Amino acid sequence: MSVSILVVDDETDVAELFRQHFRREARNGTYVMHFANSGEEALDKLTAGIEPQPIVILSDINMPQMDGLELLREIKTRRPDLPVMMGTAYGDDERRRLAGEYGAACFITKPVDFDFLKTQLRDLSDAAD
């Protein structure tokens, strides 16, 4: 079974970075990656029904307009069962606390440790099975 992931980040180079680090897994069908450049675009994709449906979302916190914390709250209102991993380059304790309070599955710091991220994704996909 493929694990479908929606990565949300306003930095345009993030999609390419994820494609590089998940190249092998994408090729063998372990992961299917979807990308959105804003919280609004992520909600549009979830509403439109991208296939396969994401079983986990990885969102940046610091984005213009709808930030990652607002996105997290909206996703948890619509799909409380969908795990959302939050990422940021800033070690802000208050944002980390809020992310946990709003229902984040875990917190990832940037630059991303892709080995750690893959372990987290495996754990979440095993829990979803």
Where are these regions (language model features)?
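Alpha4 helix (beta4-alpha4-beta5 surface) of REC/receiver domains from two-component response regulators
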Residues: 70, 90-108, 116-119
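Receiver (REC) domain active-site loop signature in two-component systems and cognate sites
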Residues: 63
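Receiver (REC) domain switch/output surface
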Residues: 117-129
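Receiver (REC) domain switch/active-site region of two-component response regulators
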Residues: 113
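Helix N-cap/capping motif at the beta->alpha junctions
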Residues: 35-47, 68
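Two-component/phosphorelay signaling modules centered on CheY-like receiver
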Residues: 12-35
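Active-site beta3 strand of CheY-like receiver
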Residues: 51-58
